[in-house]
């Protein structure tokens, strides 16, 4: 039977249509950044968006689902990056076809529908297909052999082959405990002419038998002892790689030969000017443009940490392969339009964000190209000596100075049959961290040794608390007593003081007894559940065991709470106004203001800032109550609360609802949104590539800021003698008048230069056939000096000229040499001869140079020496 040819677009559509006809709801691909699991770096399978359903913490309005999911495997446990470009089937980014049953159908329907789609829709030859089942899964085996009719010799039982009970290629587990079950994989046989054996055989890693579809049957719940019991509602989770299936249906062996990749490879060849489209580096570039573009679309900007660093590694790997092909200027970002052409219909978000994606990649590309050549020279020099291992310190220098991720250096070395001393690299990295720690001013809490009990935190409910001193520290060491005037750290058994965490600064206040007063200047965590109160004992003495009263500075706490609460509301507004790609990159919340760093690739416009302010202040006016609930992490995920990637959350978390915002947060907050009072953005700017910063104030500080602006406006209006309502018009008129006067001044200076040129020309002295002139011009600026110089050179013919102007102690110099004389005299040398005597230096072209100086007293002698200086050189 002849297998028809399907394009990638055909496969996506036919897959979804098939399962829709079987009662499945078509579900849109979720982002590459998982929204329900901050511990997972990237979405790496189709089931990620349904994880909460499988865990029983979420329900959907459907029991059958199908989707085409974008996936990424380039970081953490699931990392295919180093293999991309070297094999036929490894990718960073790929698409996963899948169908799911949530307590509805089970093995029979799943396997029969898979067989129907493959053999009747895609027309794959039945004799080319075989399946594996878990050795103990007789039900799946019987469905394959007795109901579908697959010959027993083409249904392979796979047992526990990974060193333990239920440890098998054909037994799937979500985690060490919880939902699990057997799976059945479908393989395609490329034929005996291709090397490799069937699954389960010693030669199974060959290319003959290729897995195309995995059907996972979640029918058990595993406990901590490894025992399983049946789930009340078994589920089905299947996944089939789109690129692998396309290669089979398009009658090619490598995924890179399918229509989608061929279009991208040809585009990469166009931009790198390479004729041979079989070049492996083109495959790398074609793969990486998919990964990087979709990452940007989902809010991941190149950076030096977390997901952003994985993005940076992929971008720079693609650029390095282009450089290897001879491309010395930015090219990678130009492929975005080609990607949109082949994938924009299936994923409209990349078409909608095409300009933004292109710009993000362009900025990153230009940044790396600035250092790439120098880095490659160092790498080439290090490898030229014939050593088989690149020293770790060299790899670290490439990383630290030239922005070479370690895997990029590994990539280059592997191409040359060499390896990298990764242990040496890590040693160099650790040494740098130690130096940074030693050079920095670290707070005392980092070095304190505390072995006592955790303290109770009562600061959500109270601002004052009776407590007992359980530990004291002075100069980093434990002591039994602090005396008046000593700085130290106090640890209490219970405290209302909030310790610095999550961007919120620590509380200030007072710890006191009848005879002692300790001023708390900051509160920091010694351990996760032990707070250190840093400050100075202003009077009396304080001993371990003393009963004390701990009181938080209520005004500072209230102001800090306003700023922290508004940060949550602002974060929500930023995502609504700028887009879902906005992700928090850092924050600082204190009593003065809130500072919020977020992923966004361009300045926030004045109109956008006004809309953000409008939305936030609307939430404040609504005066809705704040609600904080403590729950387990899985329940929190089910509520849709925003979580930050990289944050370590415990089993129990605090979910904060404030306005329309819902986030995990352990900070202190206002009781109602109206307590914030007023919100005003006071600053916006860039802090790194793809990261913007907004600063804002609230409450009394916002009012003070607006009153200050009003005062400035009033002063400007008074100076211009205009009502504030007419200020813009009056300023516009004044600017027009200034521009007109500037034109008049420029014209007068031009006339002055012309007249001075006529007068000065007569002062030139002939030195061996060259007219030499050194003179001072009164009231001239740099432009007047240059204009006068040009007129003098025209008048004098062969000439060497120095002109000077003085403003206070500052000297401006211009030197000019007619072109015919530049072989003997350089204007730069001439101007520096004079500049060196007036405390300055300069430079320029052989026929014109400028300089400045700071010692006008040396100018007369310097100008007087010009004639002799020229005479020595002609």
UniProtKB/Swiss-Prot annotation:
<dbReference type="GO" id="GO:0004813">
    <property type="term" value="F:alanine-tRNA ligase activity"/>
</dbReference>
<dbReference type="InterPro" id="IPR002318">
    <property type="entry name" value="Ala-tRNA-lgiase_IIc"/>
</dbReference>
<dbReference type="InterPro" id="IPR003156">
    <property type="entry name" value="DHHA1_dom"/>
</dbReference>
<dbReference type="InterPro" id="IPR045864">
    <property type="entry name" value="aa-tRNA-synth_II/BPL/LPL"/>
</dbReference>
<dbReference type="GO" id="GO:0008270">
    <property type="term" value="F:zinc ion binding"/>
</dbReference>
<dbReference type="InterPro" id="IPR023033">
    <property type="entry name" value="Ala_tRNA_ligase_euk/bac"/>
</dbReference>
<protein>
    <recommendedName>
        <fullName>Alanine--tRNA ligase</fullName>
        <ecNumber>6.1.1.7</ecNumber>
    </recommendedName>
</protein>
<dbReference type="GO" id="GO:0005524">
    <property type="term" value="F:ATP binding"/>
</dbReference>
<dbReference type="InterPro" id="IPR050058">
    <property type="entry name" value="Ala-tRNA_ligase"/>
</dbReference>
<keyword id="KW-0436">Ligase</keyword>
<dbReference type="GO" id="GO:0045892">
    <property type="term" value="P:negative regulation of DNA-templated transcription"/>
</dbReference>
<dbReference type="InterPro" id="IPR018165">
    <property type="entry name" value="Ala-tRNA-synth_IIc_core"/>
</dbReference>
<keyword id="KW-0648">Protein biosynthesis</keyword>
<keyword id="KW-0862">Zinc</keyword>
<keyword id="KW-0030">Aminoacyl-tRNA synthetase</keyword>
<feature type="binding site">
    <location>
        <position position="665"/>
    </location>
    <ligand>
        <name>Zn(2+)</name>
    </ligand>
</feature>
<dbReference type="Pfam" id="PF07973">
    <property type="entry name" value="tRNA_SAD"/>
</dbReference>
<keyword id="KW-0694">RNA-binding</keyword>
<feature type="binding site">
    <location>
        <position position="568"/>
    </location>
    <ligand>
        <name>Zn(2+)</name>
    </ligand>
</feature>
<dbReference type="InterPro" id="IPR012947">
    <property type="entry name" value="tRNA_SAD"/>
</dbReference>
<dbReference type="InterPro" id="IPR018162">
    <property type="entry name" value="Ala-tRNA-ligase_IIc_anticod-bd"/>
</dbReference>
<dbReference type="InterPro" id="IPR018164">
    <property type="entry name" value="Ala-tRNA-synth_IIc_N"/>
</dbReference>
<keyword id="KW-0820">tRNA-binding</keyword>
<feature type="binding site">
    <location>
        <position position="564"/>
    </location>
    <ligand>
        <name>Zn(2+)</name>
    </ligand>
</feature>
<dbReference type="InterPro" id="IPR018163">
    <property type="entry name" value="Thr/Ala-tRNA-synth_IIc_edit"/>
</dbReference>
<comment type="function">
    <text>Catalyzes the attachment of alanine to tRNA(Ala) in a two-step reaction: alanine is first activated by ATP to form Ala-AMP and then transferred to the acceptor end of tRNA(Ala). Also edits incorrectly charged Ser-tRNA(Ala) and Gly-tRNA(Ala) via its editing domain.</text>
</comment>
<dbReference type="GO" id="GO:0000049">
    <property type="term" value="F:tRNA binding"/>
</dbReference>
<dbReference type="InterPro" id="IPR009000">
    <property type="entry name" value="Transl_B-barrel_sf"/>
</dbReference>
<dbReference type="Pfam" id="PF02272">
    <property type="entry name" value="DHHA1"/>
</dbReference>
<keyword id="KW-0963">Cytoplasm</keyword>
<keyword id="KW-0547">Nucleotide-binding</keyword>
<comment type="similarity">
    <text>Belongs to the class-II aminoacyl-tRNA synthetase family.</text>
</comment>
<dbReference type="GO" id="GO:0002161">
    <property type="term" value="F:aminoacyl-tRNA deacylase activity"/>
</dbReference>
<dbReference type="GO" id="GO:0006419">
    <property type="term" value="P:alanyl-tRNA aminoacylation"/>
</dbReference>
<feature type="binding site">
    <location>
        <position position="669"/>
    </location>
    <ligand>
        <name>Zn(2+)</name>
    </ligand>
</feature>
<keyword id="KW-0479">Metal-binding</keyword>
<dbReference type="GO" id="GO:0005829">
    <property type="term" value="C:cytosol"/>
</dbReference>
<keyword id="KW-0067">ATP-binding</keyword>
<dbReference type="Pfam" id="PF01411">
    <property type="entry name" value="tRNA-synt_2c"/>
</dbReference>
